[in-house]
Amino acid sequence: MEKTPVKIIAKNKKAFFNYTVEEKIECGLVLKGTEVKSLREGRISFPDAFAEIKDNEVWVKNFHISEYIYSSVFNHDPERPKKLLLKKDEIKRLKRKVEEKGYTLVPLEFYFKNGIVKVLLGVCKGKKTFDKRADIKDRDIKRDMQREIKIRGK
């Protein structure tokens, strides 16, 4: 039995620049039908999205799934918070981690896995300005090295 490949809907590139990702967790997402159809078209925006734990449930907030254009009256609210599906022990572990100073839960990417929408949730710590500068400098050095290797190879 072959598994279908993962189809990435969207990645949060801004999260990798603003945060250091300590841990990644795959979790499900509670959605309505029109939200899934809209996601299949890639109509999602989540640069400032975050997750919070409330009453032993994890909720993703501050992200937008556009309304499904072919739907009529039964469309969804684009800004509503969505519940994440995790096991109780995972939620407890995340709660302990988030209660530490400086940690937050950030959705890193949304994707379809076997036809089901999944979220890659990251336990992240915010970067300081000098950390961001160091990352940019390292990236530039790598790019220059790759360029030199390419030129010498010709």
UniProtKB/Swiss-Prot annotation:
GO terms for cellular component: cytosol. Gene3D superfamilies: 2.40.280.10. It is found in: Cytoplasm. GO terms for molecular function: RNA binding. It comes from the Bacteria. InterPro entries: SmpB (IPR023620), SsrA-bd_prot (IPR000037), SsrA-bd_prot_CS (IPR020081). GO terms for biological process: trans-translation. The keyword Transcription does not apply. The keyword Cytoplasm applies. Keywords: Cytoplasm, RNA-binding. Belongs to the SmpB family. NCBIfam families: PRK05422.1, smpB. PANTHER family: SSRA-BINDING PROTEIN, TMRNA-BINDING COMPONENT OF TRANS-TRANSLATION TAGGING COMPLEX. Required for rescue of stalled ribosomes mediated by trans-translation. Binds to transfer-messenger RNA (tmRNA), required for stable association of tmRNA with ribosomes. tmRNA and SmpB together mimic tRNA shape, replacing the anticodon stem-loop with SmpB. tmRNA is encoded by the ssrA gene; the 2 termini fold to resemble tRNA(Ala) and it encodes a 'tag peptide', a short internal open reading frame. During trans-translation Ala-aminoacylated tmRNA acts like a tRNA, entering the A-site of stalled ribosomes, displacing the stalled mRNA. This is SsrA-binding protein.
